[in-house]
Regions:
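A polyanion-binding, active-site-adjacent surface
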Residues: 2-147, 153-162, 166, 184-185, ...
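A hydrophobic alpha-helix/topogenic segment detector
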Residues: 14-15, 171-212
Length: 212
């Protein structure tokens, strides 16, 4: 994983904001139940700040994603309540570790396809995501998840190497082949930001998939 982090940092200097740190996948390191793959980080994540010396994981200092995972039954409601009560500046290094200990306990690995932190949430072109796809495959191979959830049309299309419209493939199982090992994968509605209007569909689909 350390070699991947080095490569992610190099790509940050090419495709990300020069004022921000890259952030990485984190959670249950070995054999997680689910790998959750989002798009790319922005400076809303407090760990992207150059002065940050704590955990460099996804969604730190934000609220929407933790509320979403709680509604999916994949995160502690009590810890989510603590998050709701905090401003980004209230997130200490210790609290970030505490949040991701719960992620680990839930059997999750949370990552982004692109690790290049941006100043805002404007979408990245496909070409940049493609630069990260082989690295994400190595990351997924290392952690060996039971299921992979790709969030949004763009991430799903690039990683599954076919044109995906989540609305037409809800709950459909795809197979991602990495070095002759097959991983059960699903395309899920992007649940936050501009995708928040589809959040209830994403929750319903995840709950249904995990029942099987």
């Amino acid at each position: 994983m350390e070699n991947l982090i080095k490569q992610y940092d190099e790509l940050q200097n090419i495709y990300g904001s020069k004022e921000l740190n890259s952030v990485y996948g984190y959670g249950k390191r070995h054999n997680p139940k689910i790998a959750l793959v989002f798009m790319n980080p922005t400076k809303r994540n407090i760990a992207t700040n150059k002065s940050w010396t704590g955990l460099k994981a996804q969604w730190l200092g934000t609220k929407q994603i933790w509320d979403f995972l709680t509604k999916c039954g994949l995160f502690s409601a009590d810890i989510n309540d603590e998050i709701k009560a905090k401003k980004p500046s209230d997130w200490t290094y210790e609290f970030c570790e505490y949040v991701y200990k719960e992620v680990e306990n839930q059997g999750l690995w949370i990552t982004n396809l692109a690790k290049c932190s941006q100043d805002d949430a404007r979408p990245l072109p496909d070409e940049i995501f493609v630069k990260y796809s082989h690295l994400l495959k190595k990351e997924l191979e290392l952690i060996n998840p039971k299921y992979i959830f790709f969030f949004g049309n763009q991430v799903s299309s690039i990683m599954l190497e076919q044109q995906i419209s989540v609305n037409t493939v809800r709950k459909k199982k795809f197979t991602l082949d990495i070095n002759n090992k097959q991983y059960d994968s699903f395309a899920i509605f992007y649940p936050v930001g501009n995708g928040r209007f589809n959040q209830s569909k994403a929750i319903d689909d995840i709950k249904e998939i995990l029942k099987k």
